[in-house]
């Protein structure tokens, strides 16, 4: 969480943020702070929210590859999708080389640290797995 505070303060954002664990209040607080820092006020065209499993990864990836419309970045928020337990392989492959203008914020209750998606996110979110906070 300290890294997120530092990124917000400096304006140097990572392309991927992963917030996970049981502390729902902290996850929500930091997700809100990231949304305010990453997204322009009223920019609904470049801000996307996905919750649960009711979305197509193919459509998400297509949208992620699209340049933002009249904005610096496109931001995609994912909440309790279960992608870090199963089904996230396709997204992990995309995140190995994502569009530079698309940013991702994942908020999950549980993650499988053996999953390809988790390992891919660690490459962007922190210099070492030890810095990933639960």
Task: Describe each PLM feature range.
Residues 82-85, 111-113:
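A short acidic, glycine/proline-enriched capping/turn motif at secondary-structure boundaries
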């Amino acid at each position: 969480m300290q890294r997120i505070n530092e990124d917000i303060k400096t304006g140097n954002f990572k392309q991927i943020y992963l917030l996970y664990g049981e502390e729902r209040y902290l996850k929500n607080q930091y997700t809100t702070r990231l949304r305010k820092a990453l997204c322009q006020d009223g920019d609904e065209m470049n801000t996307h929210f996905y919750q649960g499993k009711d979305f197509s990864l193919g459509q998400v990836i297509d949208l992620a590859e699209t340049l933002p419309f009249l904005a610096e970045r496109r931001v995609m928020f994912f909440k309790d999708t279960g992608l870090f337990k199963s089904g996230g392989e396709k997204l992990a492959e995309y995140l190995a080389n994502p569009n530079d203008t698309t940013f991702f914020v994942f908020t999950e209750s549980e993650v499988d640290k053996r999953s390809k998606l988790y390992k891919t996110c660690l490459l962007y979110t922190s210099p070492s797995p030890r810095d990933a906070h639960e």
